[in-house]
Amino acid sequence: MKAALVIMAAGMGSRYGGNKQVDGIGPNGEILMEYSIFDALRAGFTKVVFIIKPDMRDLMENMVGKHLAARKTADGDNVEVCYAYQDFSSVPDFYEVPSERVKPFGTVHALLCAREFVHEPFVVINADDYYGVDAFKTIYAELSKLAESGEGTMVGYDLCNTVSEHGTVTRGVCHVNEQGMLDRVVETFHLKPCADGKIRDIQEDGDGPVYAPETPVSMNFWGFTPWLFEKLDAYFKDFLRALPDGELKKECLLPSLIGELIDRGELSVSVLRSSARWFGMTYHEDKEMVQRELQKLHDAGVYPKTLRA
């Protein structure tokens, strides 16, 4: 089955303190998205679509694209590589972007920018997260079961495997019904492991609500068919129409759209659970830990000495 891996890499890592999407972190300078690409191709994916800022094109081709040119799919074919640009030129003409706005419009707009390149079932992920080998195998198999419209899937991770020792994180806390289907995702903005070993939302105070370690959370690892693009387009336009004049930071987020479609009965999303250790670089201080974990995976033979052909 042909399937596309769509990687969102245009965002600015403000808390991280740099461009974490292209920060070399593997033993040979690999960046985190190279591990996702490697795992996806092994699982059966046939196309990679990078969503980037236009000025990142040369950098991305040099760091990742040129290595992909030598890679093959699981069937021995060449990997199709596409670059989609997320910038303000793709915003509908009826909306005038404030001249002071720098921040991109969020994950709905990002995915919408890849529309012309995606004509097959696809998975969309963050560029700066490590998702684990088995997660790609599981979601690839699930993609083949999706109807042409009205169905999707996601990988849910245990909350305890997704927090940082160096500060709070934002996670999409998933409410899953008895049938293993997603009811809703609640964006929770200040999750932190505390001194007593419990994970709390400390948005209001240090003794905020406690979350169970195995609480399923979304790390933006979604699977859909191209049917979703019509919904993305309509939702983004409604978002822009509702923005106050001069708004500089508000984003249009994929989990919000998915929740609305579920509430309207237009979408059902299966939740695939993963007990894998997710890791990423929310903060610059996370880098050393991620480097250690990746080296362990190479040493254990999960990955070859180098990911670059």
How should these model regions be labeled?
Residues 60-64, 139, 232, 290:
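Hydrophobic packing residues within well-ordered alpha-helices of enzyme cores
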Residues 1-19, 23:
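N-terminal nucleotide-binding beta1-loop-alpha1 segment
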Residues 133-222:
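Conserved core of the sugar-phosphate nucleotidyltransferase
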Residues 286-309:
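Generic C-terminus detector
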Residues 221-232:
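Conserved nucleotide-sugar donor-binding
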Residues 93-103, 167-172, 285-289:
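Short, surface-exposed amphipathic charged segments that create phosphate/polyanion-binding patches used
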Residues 1-4, 27-124, 131-132, 136, ...:
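Conserved N-terminal catalytic core of the sugar/cofactor nucleotidyltransferase
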Residues 232-267:
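A C-terminal functional module that forms or caps the active site or interfaces directly
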